[in-house]
């Protein structure tokens, strides 16, 4: 009989501690024999913690080649317990089906950019380092440089407003178009300087370039569309009693998760308060674990300032059939 892992004994080589790591593990409640999915492997912190918490197996997914390489290194230390798949979590259903997996017991999603991506200047995610204006989480597709140099002013303003909620989005777009007439904008620090020249400093000390960089990153990677696809896939994949844990870092992401879980954790409303709900109304597919979500404790915020806007929302799958597109909330 093989000894199970020691709870809390996370692999020493996995030094990165993800935001709300222990809370995510608690929400998923791993048990021996469970099949779990880490849909956003990143630096591997959640996967390592899950593997250490029970004699479970984990299927890890990431589109970033560097993350996939890290995953294979971790898998070598856990023979037969960790499989790493190259792809996006929005496609997890087909990725897992290709390996014969059609039901799982838990899914963890950490939405947005990972710490290794932010801290690598060559990836172009950060306005703190000089690097190519890329921002792709994978290795294919449109870059941030393509957007700022090729889209028209109105479309750039719309992206910055819609995905960054930047109230000075028109100023930003106007400044970008004016600068690119002189020369293409290809470096992160160049773009940051352009944005800072037209967006005033905020009282909370957040860099004026923050919202614009967030907006471009979301647009480049279709992050909100990916999140919607991932949530729908999780609903179909989770077995009754399975858990979903989603960590978000800004209001746009959190709104998508909150609305999805709200709609899936409530029966369809009656057409009138004087009439019963329709007999064919879809039953709730999730039960909320923490209605308002979980935020980092003061100790974690002190140790990791990047955690300041994080929120964990989690839910348990019921036995009701997954909703179809167009089903009432």
UniProtKB/Swiss-Prot annotation:
Family matches, as InterPro entries: RsmH, SAM-dep_MeTrfase_MraW_recog, SAM-dependent_MTases_sf
General function of this protein: Specifically methylates the N4 position of cytidine in position 1402 (C1402) of 16S rRNA.
One GO cellular component term noted in the UniProt record for this chain: cytoplasm
Family classification: Belongs to the methyltransferase superfamily. RsmH family.
Region (Disordered): 297-329
Catalytic reaction list: cytidine(1402) in 16S rRNA + S-adenosyl-L-methionine = N(4)-methylcytidine(1402) in 16S rRNA + S-adenosyl-L-homocysteine + H(+)
Positions annotated to bind S-adenosyl-L-methionine: 44-46, 62, 110, 117
Subcellular locations according to the entry: Cytoplasm
Biological process terms in GO annotation: rRNA base methylation
HAMAP family cross-referenced by the UniProt entry: 16SrRNA_methyltr_H
Protein name in the entry: Ribosomal RNA small subunit methyltransferase H
Keywords attached to this entry: Cytoplasm, Methyltransferase, rRNA processing, S-adenosyl-L-methionine, Transferase
GO MF term list: rRNA (cytosine-N4-)-methyltransferase activity
Known EC number: 2.1.1.199
UniProt-listed NCBIfam families: 16S rRNA (cytosine(1402)-N(4))-methyltransferase RsmH
Domain of life per record: Bacteria
């Amino acid at each position: 009989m093989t000894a199970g892992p020691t709870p809390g004994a996370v692999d020493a080589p996995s030094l990165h501690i993800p935001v709300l790591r222990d809370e995510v593990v608690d929400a998923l409640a791993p048990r021996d024999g469970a099949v779990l999915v880490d849909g956003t492997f990143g630096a591997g912190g959640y996967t390592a913690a899950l593997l250490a918490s029970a004699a479970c197996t984990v299927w890890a997914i990431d589109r970033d080649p560097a993350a996939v390489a890290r995953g294979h290194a971790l898998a070598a230390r856990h023979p037969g317990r960790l499989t790493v798949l190259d792809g996006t979590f929005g496609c997890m259903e087909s990725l897992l089906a290709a390996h014969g997996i059609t039901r799982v017991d838990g899914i963890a999603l950490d939405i947005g950019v990972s710490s290794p991506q932010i801290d690598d200047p060559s990836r172009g995610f950060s306005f703190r380092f000089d690097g190519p204006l890329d921002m792709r989480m994978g290795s294919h597709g449109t870059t941030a440089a393509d957007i700022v140099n090729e889209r028209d002013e109105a479309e750039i303003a719309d992206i910055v407003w819609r995905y960054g909620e930047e109230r000075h989005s028109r100023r930003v777009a106007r400044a970008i178009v004016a600068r690119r007439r002189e020369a293409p904008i290809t470096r992160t620090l160049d773009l940051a300087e352009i944005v800072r020249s037209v967006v005033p400093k905020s009282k909370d000390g957040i860099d004026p370039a923050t919202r614009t960089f967030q907006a471009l990153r979301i647009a480049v990677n279709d992050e909100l569309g990916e999140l919607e696809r991932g949530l729908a896939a999780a609903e179909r994949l989770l077995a009754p009693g399975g858990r979903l844990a989603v960590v978000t870092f800004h209001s746009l992401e959190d709104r998508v998760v909150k609305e999805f879980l709200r709609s899936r954790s409530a029966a369809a409303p009656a057409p009138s308060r004087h009439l019963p709900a329709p007999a064919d109304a879809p039953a709730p597919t999730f039960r909320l674990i923490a209605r308002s979500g979980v935020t980092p404790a003061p100790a974690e915020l002190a140790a990791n300032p990047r955690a300041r806007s994080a929120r964990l929302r989690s839910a348990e799958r019921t036995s009701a059939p997954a909703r179809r597109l167009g089903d009432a909330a």
